[in-house]
From Swiss-Prot:
Domain of life per record: Bacteria
Name of the protein in question: Bacteriocin serracin-P 23 kDa subunit
GO biological process: defense response to bacterium; killing of cells of another organism
Function: Major component of a prophage tail tube.
The UniProt record lists the keyword Zinc: no
Transmembrane segments: none
Keywords of the record: Antibiotic, Antimicrobial, Bacteriocin
Length: 22
């Protein structure tokens, strides 16, 4: 499992990827 900090960074990155798609 990833540390919490990395998990949130990954969610943040996914959010940017989603915005780039939309």
């Amino acid at each position: 499992a990833l540390p919490k900090k990395l998990k949130y960074l990954n969610l943040f990155n996914d959010g940017f990827n989603y915005m780039g798609v939309v």
